[in-house]
UniProtKB/Swiss-Prot annotation:
Ranges of compositional bias, category Polar residues: 94-105
Name the UniProt record assigns to this protein: Endonuclease 8-like 2
Biological processes, Gene Ontology terms: base-excision repair
UniProt keyword annotation of Zinc-finger present: yes
Annotated domain remarks: The zinc-finger domain is important for DNA binding.
Domain of life: Eukaryota
Gene of this entry: NEIL2
In-chain residues carrying the UniProt-annotated modification N6-acetyllysine: K50, K154
Subunit structure: Binds EP300.
């Protein structure tokens, strides 16, 4: 699943289409029925963590003043630099996907908190005007171009990826959404205090959450406190902070938790800026065999017993496990 920086890039790609009417639709989505969007007007787009929200209206009226918040500082600064490839963006340091973008091969949940949203074929009245887009493992947005196969799939076919949704707009351009789930909702779920890339990100709330008596690698992936944070950011922030992924938050000092939050924000912001400047975000431990110091990197799946196990990379020498911390086997 694309992490916060990449989804914000998707938001940037979609934004120029706001104010245009959808004149033609396409795509393979069966739950959404792409034809239900034809003749609607794209009036707004918002982003929160790993989710993208698009507002559609049946007429050309604009939304209420202030419905779309101004760009956040990291995004605004990055936009000034300009994007190297405005058509499509991918993940750093991963394997090649069927459409040629770079992604991790690990399993990830296909959408979070789906029960909060109603899936309908079309918006009804004032309700359901916001289309919520949750991207899958190889999720992407393309502008005025379709994704093409750059390698054969497992069956040996050179079949181009099929977009879930295609929106041709009155301005002459089109958007193609790949590997995503879409559902209608009455309003966007936007909580800036939890978004790691928002200027309103609540550090105090995040620090309090990190103090829980559970491995910090679990807490970092909790979107209630670190919206937009995924497995890449988790691994890189922990390595840069010198914290073992299974360290209990309750045994870490306040200063170490502060350092960890600093690295979460710094790495995420640098990744976002790199997206707009056409620079790949280099990782130091994620999917690496050695850390920058030349030590062997360990890899294992960690997660709650009743939750998803996520692949985790760490350096035992740079991120030592303290004696008062539990053994790894208790949490793997």
């Amino acid at each position: 699943m694309p992490e916060g920086p990449l989804v914000r890039k998707f938001h940037h790609l979609v934004s120029p289409f706001v104010g245009q009417q959808v004149v033609k639709t396409g795509g393979s989505s069966k739950k959404l029925q792409p034809a239900s969007l034809q003749c609607l007007w794209l009036q707004d787009t918002q982003v929160n963590g790993k989710k993208l929200f698009l507002r559609f209206d049946p007429d050309e009226e604009m939304g209420p003043p202030g419905s779309s918040p101004p760009p956040e500082p990291p995004q605004k600064e990055a936009q000034k630099e300009g994007a190297a490839d405005p058509k499509q963006v991918g993940e750093p340091s991963g394997q090649k996907t069927p459409d040629g973008s770079s992604q991790s091969a690990e399993l990830v949940p296909q959408g979070e908190d789906d029960s909060e949203y109603l899936e309908r074929d079309a918006p009804a009245g004032d309700a359901g005007r916001w289309l919520r887009v949750s991207f899958g493992l190889f999720g992407s947005v393309w502008v005025n171009e379709f994704s093409r196969a750059k390698q054969a799939n497992k069956r040996g076919d050179w079949r181009d990826p099929s977009p879930r949704l295609v929106l041709h707009c009155g301005g002459g351009g089109f958007l193609a959404f790949y590997n995503c789930q879409m559902s209608w909702s009455s309003s966007p779920v936007v909580t800036p205090t939890c978004d790691i890339l928002s200027e309103k990100f609540h550090r105090g709330q995040a620090l309090e959450a990190l103090g829980q008596a559970q491995p910090v690698c679990y807490t970092l992936l909790d979107q209630r406190y670190f919206s937009g944070l995924g497995n890449i950011i988790k691994n890189e922030a922990l390595y840069r902070a010198g914290i073992h992924p299974l360290s209990l938050g309750s045994v870490l000092s306040a200063s170490r938790r502060e350092v960890l939050v600093d690295h979460v924000v710094e790495f995420s912001t640098a990744w976002l800026q790199g997206k707009f400047q056409g620079r790949p975000q280099r990782t130091q431990v994620y999917q690496r065999e050695q850390c920058p110091a030349g030590h062997q990197v360990m890899k294992e799946a960690f997660g709650p017993q009743d939750g998803l196990q996520r692949l985790t990379w760490w350096c035992p020498q740079c991120q030592p496990q303290l004696s008062e911390e539990p053994e790894q086997r208790q949490f793997s």
